[in-house]
Swiss-Prot record:
This is Co-chaperonin GroES. Together with the chaperonin GroEL, plays an essential role in assisting protein folding. The GroEL-GroES system forms a nano-cage that allows encapsulation of the non-native substrate proteins and provides a physical environment optimized to promote and accelerate protein folding. GroES binds to the apical surface of the GroEL ring, thereby capping the opening of the GroEL channel. It comes from Bartonella bacilliformis (strain ATCC 35685 / KC583 / Herrer 020/F12,63). It is found in: Cytoplasm. GO terms for biological process: chaperone cofactor-dependent protein refolding. Belongs to the GroES chaperonin family. The gene is groES. Heptamer of 7 subunits arranged in a ring. Interacts with the chaperonin GroEL. GO terms for cellular component: cytoplasm.
Length: 98
């Protein structure tokens, strides 16, 4: 994403999904058509925050490089420079993985 000229606005973040395993614990390979999309990702770009009631900018808690969990239906899928990414609001993020 470093060579991309895209920067999300306000409280939005750009997320790259983390690929899930395509094999079960028993060794059965799951085809792409039967796999669920992962709900884990890496934040690759963040907006500059939102304005509070006093007009002060409140920055986001997540930052580039954070590994996050998000809801199954969170975000909007977009393609930027040929890469499938998600754009979502920070409130759609459930937590940061340590």
């Amino acid at each position: 994403m470093a060579n991309t000229k895209f920067r999300p606005l306000h409280d939005r973040v750009v997320v790259r999904r983390v690929e899930s395993e395509n094999k079960t614990a028993g060794g059965i390979i799951i085809p792409d058509t039967a796999q669920e999309k992962p709900q884990e990702g890496e934040v690759i770009a963040v907006g500059n925050g939102v304005l509070n009631d006093n007009g002060q900018r409140v920055s986001l808690e997540v930052k580039e490089g954070d590994r996050i969990l998000f809801g199954k239906w969170s975000g909007t899928e977009v393609k930027i420079n040929g890469e499938e990414l998600l754009i979502m609001k920070e409130s759609d993020i459930m937590g940061i993985l340590a």
